[in-house]
Structure formats: C-alpha cells, structure tokens
C-alpha cells in the first residue's frame, strides 16, 4: 500500500458528504446484535466470595440510535454456580424479555471464550469474539462508578478497571487481493457524522457519539483507504469485527488495523520521519476525541460513495 500525505477534508468536501442529494440510504443490517460480559464483580457474599454477573447490552449499529433505547439486561450469579448452564439460562431469560432476539453476541474477554461460546451455541446464537463493544464498555464503566459502590457487600479493594489488556499480537499482512493503492488521514467534525445515514455506504457500522459525551465541535480523525477493489475490501473487513486503527512506533513503525479478539493487520509501514509524525498526530487526535475515529474505504479520491465506513473507538 503506498503512503500518502496527511490531508484534511476541505469545507466543500464536508458539504458534499453532508448535503449530497438523491442518495440511496443504506441500512447496514436489520439484525439485532448483543454485547455480553460474564465475569466477577466487586461485590462479596457472606463468605467473602465475589458475585459474578452477566451484563448484556444491545449494539446501537448507527449514529442516530438513542442510547436510552438500547436493550439492557443484567443478572448476578453466585460464584458456586458459574458455568455454561447458568449462563444459557440467563441468556434465555434475556431473550424472553427483549423486543427481538439477537443474531449474534459479541464478547471481549478471551478467558471466558469456552463458557460463553458453549452457552450461546446451545441457545442458538452465534458467539463472536470482538472488541467492538462500545455500548457495553460504557455501561460497565457507569456501573463501576454509580452502581456497584452502592450495593451491599461492595469491596473497593477488589474493584478494578473495566478495560482489559492483553499482550500485543504480531500483525499480519492483508490478503494480496485486498491491498489498497493509497491512504490518507482525514478529519471530520463530530456533528458532521450526524449526516452519516444519508451517505451512500455499502458496509459499515457506527454508534451514537452521545454514548461518549463527544462535543459536536470535536475533530474526529479518520483514515481513508483507496482501492480499485474497494467493495471486496470493505466486504472482507465487515466480516472480521473491526476494533480500531492504531499507529505504532516500534521497529518497524506501522499503521495497523486491530480486529476480532486479538487479530491485527498491517495497513502501511511508516517508513520515514514524515509519515511517523503524521501517525503521532493521528494518535493525538484520537486521544483528544476519547479514542473515537473512523475508517473509510473508497474506490478513489473523487468517489462520492463509500464501499465501507466504520466509526471506531480505541478504549484505553
């Protein structure tokens, strides 16, 4: 993939995206997706053992979805009952209470893979290891600060951050047939993303910025990949559970795409001081936007449609 200097969309480009008429409105998916966590919580029983809890939150899928409309479910579990049978029963209870059952369930904790996968499959739902769990992570953070401390048996000593860190994995090369020809850093005001439902997008996913209290004037950084095989590239990316784009500055310095529970893909080599500085600027812009950024796929810079567009977050 060749390197391209960092650019910013000019006002005309933003206007084209926001005010383009006669677009085909693309509905990414009508399927319901859930995000799930099943793990111990900082609440102790009478034997000083931690309670476990299953937390389920519906994935918002689009920028216009109201956070308050997302289906949520939670249920505590005695530590002696932690197994796939209990989790399956809890899933069945959640499905009975939900407006619609999910087609798949995302989960981010690798150490719970076997139990979660078994319970989901026995319930007839596809389990998907994924770090694209923005709504779930925000609900977990809220419970850590506003809910658990007010519960009987709360143990501040055992409370920990909701984020989970794992050792970095070695990035893989993108399939040869899906290599892009050019790429560019871009920036877009948060409020411009409100128009995303009007853009012509073949594959993608997003979430409401209200989930993260992002100011409408915040500059959201992004990366556009230009490819003559834009649609196949976007279709492939839609199936690997994108997580976030990240510039790393080891040896060698790279621009990588994180996906699934632990996968990473090389988008470009940052092989000179200029591209490395651009990568650092991209990372700083992400930090200023609470980790929010986007990845777009187009056939060429003149295209007015997107083969793919994903709103992403790297949650630290």
Question: Which sequence ranges carry the predicted segments?
Answer:
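Secondary-structure boundary/capping micro-motif
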Residues: 2-316
